[in-house]
């Protein structure tokens, strides 16, 4: 069962994404910001199959988190989420380390498809 770390500062979004992903049998762990997510990753030795993170968060944003994860856990797939066009542009410069950027608002089907695609790419 794939383990997925979800980082988002909005409780309702973390809950929605975790429930959607759990529908496919994935184990989810959540963090309120990038710093907490990085701490979890480090403590667990990167033992996750996918990081799904919002870009705009306090303490450590998703871009900084993605850069740290790419450095420390280069095999971990990363999906970014954003509701802002300018952040999507910022993320486009990270194509080498980010699998995809999911635009908010999204449907449950959209996020499940994005996660399935990222996990399939990890196995390829």
Please provide the spans of the model-predicted regions:
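Charged docking surfaces used in two-component/phosphorelay signaling
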Residues: 15-23
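Short hydrophobic/Thr-rich beta-strand motif most characteristic of the beta2 strand and flanking loop
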Residues: 25-32, 39-40
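C-terminal output helix
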Residues: 106-119, 123
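Acidic catalytic/metal-coordinating carboxylates
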Residues: 33-36, 61-65
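Conserved sequence signature across two-component system core domains
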Residues: 7-8, 31, 51
């Amino acid at each position: 069962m794939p383990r997925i770390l979800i980082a988002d500062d909005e409780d309702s979004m973390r809950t929605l994404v975790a429930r959607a992903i759990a529908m496919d049998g994935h184990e989810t762990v959540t963090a309120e910001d990038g710093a907490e997510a990085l701490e979890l990753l480090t403590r667990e030795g990167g033992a996750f199959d996918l990081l799904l993170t919002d870009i705009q968060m306090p303490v450590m944003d998703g871009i900084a988190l993605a850069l740290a994860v790419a450095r420390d856990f280069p095999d971990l797939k990363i999906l970014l989420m954003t509701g802002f066009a300018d952040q999507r542009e910022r993320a486009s410069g990270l194509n080498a380390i980010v699998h995809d950027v999911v635009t908010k608002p999204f449907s449950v089907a959209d996020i499940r498809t994005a996660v399935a695609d990222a996990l399939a790419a990890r196995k390829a």
